[in-house]
């Protein structure tokens, strides 16, 4: 079974672990799932979503690649803007949903569902033009901070002011 970069930390925090999408993932901690649910709904919860697929597509053909494989006008995205969209097959049928973020004119980051990532990445690779490169970021952690106090947690713990960060926007921060 695969593990995320945070696996040892989950074990140290005595998480109850279970298989999900081929990964040994935490499903709850000692406080219990109900307490965790309420904490996240009232405050903020941090989730390890590193099992999801993460890819970087860059190069002169990157934009054309996304415009071919999704029905979205990815070219209209400004830099540091994300779009929830779908990955389509040759007939326009939906393969999976994903989030594509435009980082620069020719550089994109995408997050793909865990259960389908191998199939999705293979489809992407088979449609990649010669003037674009796809990197599967397998060893990178991915965290989701959720809840009404998420903005405050970012500010208090990392000094990040996300108050002006809009919906589906991206911000880089080095710690």
Residue positions per predicted region:
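Basic, glycine/lysine-rich polyanion-binding surfaces/domains
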Residues: 1-175
